[in-house]
């Protein structure tokens, strides 16, 4: 036996340690790309499902500006159809592969940017794969769940197929490029749920990804950090607002800033109070047409929401929705999502889109009316005080939204300025530190101040389990 192999065994024996415990665990430093396409799943969920015992970070900005020196795996789950992988990205990927890094690209036949990317390496996504799927490599063991599109390989001999469909067409394959490994597969072979509840194929994804990353040395002692919303490529100061965006989204930044600044006065008028100090003071642009978020100070806005910039009505509703989430803090609303969109519809109307705004309000209420024509049987959670069956799933969601819109419309019919009066009263009465909770009882108490009449009997009549004696906010006589 060679000395370099014998020495660890001798040391282990002398120290009384099992030699197997001396084997170094392969280390993976994974970077998941959010710059080309933002999804809540890509923001930490992929890592949680498939590399939970390894280090993982995200890149919210341009890929070519990310420091990959201490990374050995790059995960590209998708690219918004409005964007593409630019030449600087391809140069970065080629250099990373040449240095031994692993790159995972998932996609489908309909993903034009992903197809264009893998086309640079001799691959494209084809038609739907046929089940059952089968492993073609020892790394893949156990059941193969999910689905997706097959791969068309221009030089099959350059690739190693890991999974094939019933017709022996490749579904997951890898090839060596430089010292690195390119791994291409059907998007449906991995999870996608924002709550990370669908960790399909986790048993074999981990060894496959670890093997792909094995060609590049990393140092666990050195820093390995991601680039988040606060570290995008560009920062623009516009009054109290800080706008951040990546190189990819630079062509859309001017339009996004303009519509946000144009909408703010209308939002503030509807809310009745200015934003609290620091709230919604930072905006980051997201490469997506669906989904944003608010953390109070920071707001993430989907640049392509509602076919923006071709149309502005849905974008007005969306950015108002996210802004309202910051406006209502520190106490979220009992109808937190619906009221944010409802105010968004009112702002849409104020900004010249009256017909579309009222149509959306009407449609939302009608979805609840189809479940309960009286709109008096259920509360916001689909629970009935009168013995009607509890609502579940989609019906509960339709009731939550429709009932909230209906209540707010009933109040607005009595006082067109009710939203502004309500939020002014809430700002005065719901003080941080003085209030432990802001529930339905507190909500009705604040509405009483805004409307100047007792609303507890009416809310009980329409299905809310509220009691004036349980309100954490004093109820006016």
Predicted features and spans:
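Juxtacatalytic substrate-recognition/specificity segment
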Residues: 232-327, 331-332
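An acidic, glycine-rich "communication" segment
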Residues: 23-27, 43-44, 106-180, 221-225
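Extracellular ligand-binding/catalytic regions of CAZymes and related secreted enzymes
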Residues: 22-30, 35-49, 69-70, 95, ...
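Sec/Tat signal peptide C-region and signal peptidase I cleavage site
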Residues: 17-21
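Bacterial N-terminal signal peptides
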Residues: 4-16
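Zinc-dependent metallopeptidase catalytic helix centered on the HExxH motif
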Residues: 302-370
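Active-site-proximal alpha-helical
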Residues: 267, 339, 347, 369-467
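Helical hinge/lid and interdomain linker segments adjacent to catalytic or ligand-binding clefts
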Residues: 27-116, 120, 152, 279-287, ...
